[in-house]
Each structure stands twice: as C-alpha cells, then as structure tokens.
Amino acid sequence: WIRLGPLSFQPSEIAKICYIFAGAATLERLFHKRNLTLFIVLTGVCIGLLGLMSDFGTAAIFFVTFLVIAYMRSGDFATLSLICGGAVFGAGIILKFKPYILSRFASWGHAWEAASTTGYQQTRTMSAAASGGLLGMGAGNGWLHNVAAADTDLVFGMLCEEWGLLIAVLAVGAIITLAFFAARACRVGRSSFYTIAACAASSLLVFQTCLNVFGSVDLLPLTGVTFPFVSNGGSAMMSAWGLLAYLKATDTRENASFAIARKHQRRLTQAARRRVEPIGDPFGTEKEERHEEN
C-alpha cells in the first residue's frame, strides 16, 4: 500500500489498467517478435515487482492476462508453452526463497483439519455461506463480518450469508456475462486495440472472480484477491470500473459505427424521397380546368 496523507491506495490495482493498455497498444499492429519480446519484458517486470510486494494473487492474474493477450495476437501454442514452463520455474524459485507461501497450500483441500490455524478463514466462510441458505439472513444480520478480511477476500461468503446463494450466483453470473459481451465484441470490433483490451479486461475480471470465490470456499488456495465490484476498497473498485471502461469503449465504437450508418442511410432515404415527390401540377391540368370554366 502507498499512503499519501489520509489517503492510501494499492498500486497493483491501478497497474491492472495500465498493463492492459500497454499490452493492447504494443500488440495492436501486425504481430512482430519484437513487440512480443517487449511485452514479455514488461510482464516480467510487473510480476517481479508484485512478487517483491508478496502480492502473488495479483501476479497470477497478470500472468493469465498476459497469456490471453499474447495468444490473441500470435496464436502460437509453442511459444506460450515455453512461457508457461518458464513461469513454473520462476514460481519454484520464489517458493524456495519465500517458503511461507506454502502455508497457504498446506491447508488447501482440507481446511477443516486446520480449522483453528491455517484454515480458519475458509472454514468460517463456508459455515457462514451455508447458514445463509437461498435467500440469506438479511443485510447486516450475519456474523462473518467479525472475521478478518470478510468484506474483501471473503466477501463471497458474506454475500451468501446475508443476501443468499441466489444473489451470490447472480453476482458471479454478471461477471461471466461481461466475458460473453467481450467475446461478441471481438467478432465485430473495428479496432484491434479495443478488441484485445476488452478480451484481456474480461479475462482478468473472470479469473480474479474465480480466485476469490473458489479460494474462499477452499476449492483453490486463498490468494487474497478481491471480488470485482463487490469487495470493499476504493482501489479495487476504481480498478474494476477502469477495466469495465475498456468494454464500454468497444461498445461505443460499434454503436458509433452503426449510428453513422443509420445517419447516412437516413440522408439517402430523404434524397430519394425528394426525387420521387410529385411536383405541383407538372402537366398543367389546373390551367385546362380554369380555361373550361371560363
């Protein structure tokens, strides 16, 4: 965290927006190995800095986002396989120098066996989620808020407890809907920059949601990432809305193109109507009728 007087923010959240912008801008033109090399270097620097800050959940999010952007421009599975192999090797080195990270994996899959130690948060989250049922206990009526990070890392359990499983599933479904929207935008997008940015942003949001939801119920190790648009925190909320702006920008460009087409079509229709509208008395019939009356 960086503190500026009474304000504090998490730089990794702001870096998500900048990273997608840099990746989409770097690979917007025709694919070149030089562009991919620069992007790989940028990704390595970002993940390395996140590792120094011990924010390995966000580092995993950056890596998955990198794979999405790189594949969209290259489509080369061989290169991506080598990158994944290097990432596994790097993760092994990190675990060697920071062995405390393994404690998060120690209780993975059997949190109830360590309910009072490393599995404390997950077991409390699962109990609270189960007590909420389908419709929940009501806003503010739960007890999970007494557990540390209940409104950030464990917010899915808090959502299930107070608002019910139905609302929690709808919240996850809303993030998945954004991914379907991004996939549709890829097929009709006019700009490769916005297409790459929209898909990368939606992939980031979906993967981050999976880490938060599955981590809180012990299906994945608890990584400490937030639930987009739901978790408490100004930095996380600003980051989520910033990522959503990429999808909106793609939609604006598409709608703008349709608006231009409709405007052009409207002009053609008006011009055609003017050509076919009858001119007042083109055959002089009124003059003949007046002559007969006289």
Where are these regions (language model features)?
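Membrane-helix boundary/helix-loop-helix interface segments in multi-pass membrane proteins
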Residues: 1-53, 213-228, 232, 236-239, ...
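Hydrophobic alpha-helical transmembrane segments
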Residues: 16, 161-182
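Interfacial segments of multi-pass membrane proteins
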Residues: 24-27, 65-79, 143-167, 226-241
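Loop-to-helix entry and N-terminal half of a specific, functionally important transmembrane alpha helix
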Residues: 186-224, 230
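Structural signal for the C-terminal ends of transmembrane alpha-helices
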Residues: 23-31, 67-76, 94-95, 176-187, ...
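Alpha-helical transmembrane segments of polytopic integral membrane proteins
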Residues: 20, 24, 50, 98, ...
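Hydrophobic, glycine- and aromatic-enriched re-entrant/interface helices and adjoining loop segments
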Residues: 1, 81-171, 190-197
